[in-house]
């Protein structure tokens, strides 16, 4: 019995230490910069800086069907599946535009231009420059799935309608954690706003 207790405590200690290192790595990962313009009860308004993204369009719909395939394709590119066998740093969050078609995006680290990026060996991967934009975002914890994404999308949409804030109706899922980070997971649903005024 004593041996079992000791082993259990040892395993728990290892898990806690390993997860603390994972969390530290997540915090230090370059993120898409934004400024919070206004905070509401259920969501906040952000101004995102211009950024360059690598992206891929997926035939499958929904988070469950698309997330694994899209991640593997884009991760392959930044891990060296490109014309120069060049590794590119991971950034956060991973963005998924969910709708009739699904797109996944990784932000390109600051300092790169499209001309400087190595061409992907996978021709499905494209680069996209996104200009400064205003977005509304709602956060939720835990593991994401299609039901949670639909639930929080509906909450955000209803909250925006209640405040008479116009939006594009093109919602995205933002995931901030690697799959091996088990606690304190951060997920968001975001949508670009139309002619937003900070006076609302």
What are these regions (language model features)?
Residues 2-200:
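A solvent-exposed interaction/effector surface
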């Amino acid at each position: 019995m004593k041996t079992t207790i000791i082993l259990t405590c040892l395993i728990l200690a290892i898990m806690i230490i390993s997860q603390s290192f994972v969390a530290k790595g997540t915090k230090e990962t370059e993120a898409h910069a934004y400024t919070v313009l206004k905070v509401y009860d259920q969501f906040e308004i952000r101004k995102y800086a211009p950024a360059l993204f690598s992206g891929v369009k997926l035939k499958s719909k929904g988070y469950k069907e698309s997330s694994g395939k899209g991640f593997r394709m884009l991760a392959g590119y930044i891990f060296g599946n490109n014309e120069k066998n060049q590794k590119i740093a991971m950034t956060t969050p991973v963005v998924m535009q969910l709708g009739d078609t699904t797109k996944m995006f990784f932000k390109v680290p600051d300092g790169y231009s499209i001309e400087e990026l190595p061409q992907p060996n996978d021709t499905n991967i494209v680069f996209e420059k996104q200009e400064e934009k205003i977005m509304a975002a709602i956060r939720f914890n835990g593991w994401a799935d299609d039901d949670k994404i639909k639930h929080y999308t509906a909450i955000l949409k209803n909250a925006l309608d209640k405040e008479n804030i116009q939006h594009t109706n093109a919602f995205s899922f933002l995931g901030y954690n690697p799959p091996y980070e088990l606690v304190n997971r951060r997920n968001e649903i975001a949508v670009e706003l139309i002619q937003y005024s900070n006076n609302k």
